[in-house]
C-alpha cells in the first residue's frame, strides 16, 4: 500500500514541539500518568481501536499506566466514570455521544480529574475536554480516488448514524469525488447502528444492483459485499486492505496519537484544561492520513491526489466541513 500523509511519531513530535505542546521530544515522562478509558463497544471496533492503539503506545513508552473498560452500556457509563475518578485516575478517556449531559455532570463533581471525551458538543471548564475523528481531509482525498476510477459514475455510501461526526466525512468524500468527476452520482443510506454487518451488507447489495461500482464503507459489512460482487470499496478510519485483497482502493485513516500525546503532556505538566482537541486529528498534526493501493489506483490519479494533499497540509487548500445529512442524488 502507498501511504499519503503517513503518520509517524517523528512528525507529531515535530508538530507538537513547534506549537509548544511538549517540553522535549522522544523522552518518556518522569512519572507515568494514570489513565483509564471507557468504551461502549469492544476495543476491536474500528473507531475505538484507534484510541486503544494510541493509549497502548503511550503505555509501551512508559508515559502512562493504562486500564480500560469495554462494552460499557450508556446506562452504566456514569458509574464507571465515577469509579475510575474515585480510584485516583488522572486522565479518563472515552466517548459520550449517548450521555453528554451525564458525563459533564461527573466531570463537574471531580474537578481534579482530567476528562477527554469523544463528543458532539464543546468542552466545559475546568476539566472536560472533547475530541473526534476529524478526518474529513483524507476523506476528501479518498473521494478523489473514487471519483476518478468509477466507470458507472455511481458510488454507494453506507454509514452508521446520520450524526455530524459521520456526515462530515461522507460529505467531504462526495466533494472530493465531484472535484475530479462532476458527473458522479451517489446512493446514500444509514443503517442506524454502529455494528450490524448483515444490514450494511444488504444495503450495499441493493446499491450495487442500482449500478454502484464503488462502495464507501463507513461501516463493517460493506466491504464484504464488495468482495462478493467484485466491486471496489473505500475504507474508513482503519486500513482493512489485507482483509479484503484487490478490493480497497484507498482508506482515510485516523491516528489518535497526536491527541493522546497532547493530553498526557498537559496532565503531566499540570496544564490540562477544558479545550477542543479536534484539530489534532487534522493531517497537519499527523492525526489523519490516506493510504492507497498502487495496484488498483493508476499513477496519474495517485499523483493528482498527492498534489492536493500537499496543498492541504501546506494550508493552501481547505476541505469544507459540512455536518448536514448527505442524501442520494437519485
Give residue spans per PLM region.
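Periplasmic-binding protein-like
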Residues: 37, 89-96, 116-118, 210-220, ...
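Flexible loop/hinge segments that line or gate small-molecule binding clefts
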Residues: 108-133, 237-247
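Hinge/cleft segment of the Venus flytrap/periplasmic-binding protein
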Residues: 269-330
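Short beta-strand elements at the ligand-binding edges of bilobed clamshell
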Residues: 123-145, 157-162, 245-258
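Extracytoplasmic "Venus flytrap"
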Residues: 34-61, 67-77, 97, 162-168
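Sec/Tat signal peptide C-region and signal peptidase I cleavage site
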Residues: 24-30
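An alpha-beta-alpha
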Residues: 55, 141-184, 188, 276-297
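Bacterial N-terminal signal peptides that target proteins for export
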Residues: 2-15
Amino acid at each position: 500500500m502507498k501511504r499519503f500523509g503517513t503518520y509517524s511519531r517523528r512528525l507529531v513530535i515535530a508538530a507538537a514541539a513547534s506549537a509548544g505542546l511538549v517540553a522535549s521530544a522522544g523522552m518518556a515522562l518522569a512519572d507515568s500518568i494514570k489513565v483509564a478509558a471507557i468504551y461502549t463497544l469492544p476495543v476491536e471496533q474500528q473507531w475505538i481501536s484507534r484510541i486503544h492503539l494510541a493509549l497502548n503506545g503511550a503505555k509501551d513508552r512508559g508515559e502512562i499506566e493504562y486500564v480500560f473498560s469495554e462494552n460499557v452500556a450508556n446506562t452504566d457509563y456514569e458509574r464507571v466514570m465515577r469509579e475510575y475518578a474515585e480510584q485516583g485516575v488522572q486522565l479518563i478517556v472515552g466517548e459520550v455521544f449517548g450521555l453528554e449531559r451525564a458525563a459533564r455532570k461527573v466531570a463537574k463533581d471531580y474537578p481534579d480529574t482530567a476528562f477527554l471525551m469523544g463528543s458532539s458538543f464543546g468542552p466545559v471548564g475546568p476539566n472536560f475536554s472533547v475530541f473526534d475523528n476529524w478526518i474529513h481531509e483524507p476523506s476528501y482525498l479518498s473521494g478523489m480516488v473514487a471519483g476518478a476510477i468509477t466507470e458507472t459514475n455511481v458510488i454507494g455510501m453506507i454509514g452508521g448514524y446520520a450524526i455530524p461526526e459521520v456526515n462530515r466525512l461522507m460529505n467531504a468524500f462526495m466533494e472530493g469525488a465531484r472535484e475530479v468527476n462532476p458527473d458522479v452520482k451517489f446512493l446514500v443510506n444509514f443503517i442506524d447502528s454502529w455494528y450490524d454487518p448483515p444490514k450494511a451488507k444488504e444495503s450495499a447489495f441493493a446499491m450495487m444492483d442500482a449500478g454502484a461500482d464503488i462502495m464507501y464503507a463507513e461501516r463493517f459489512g460493506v466491504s464484504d459485499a464488495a468482495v462478493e460482487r467484485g466491486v471496489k470499496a473505500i475504507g474508513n478510519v482503519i486500513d482493512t486492505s489485507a482483509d479484503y485483497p484487490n478490493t480497497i482502493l484507498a482508506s482515510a485513516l485516523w491516528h489518535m496519537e497526536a491527541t493522546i500525546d497532547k493530553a498526557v503532556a498537559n496532565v503531566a505538566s499540570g496544564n490540562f484544561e477544558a479545550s477542543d482537541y479536534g484539530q489534532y486529528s487534522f493531517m497537519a498534526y499527523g492525526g489523519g492520513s490516506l493510504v492507497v493501493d498502487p495496484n488498483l489506483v493508476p499513477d496519474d490519479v495517485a499523483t493528482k491526489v498527492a498534489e492536493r494533499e500537499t496543498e492541504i497540509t501546506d494550508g493552501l487548500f481547505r476541505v469544507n466541513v459540512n455536518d448536514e445529512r448527505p442524501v442520494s442524488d437519485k
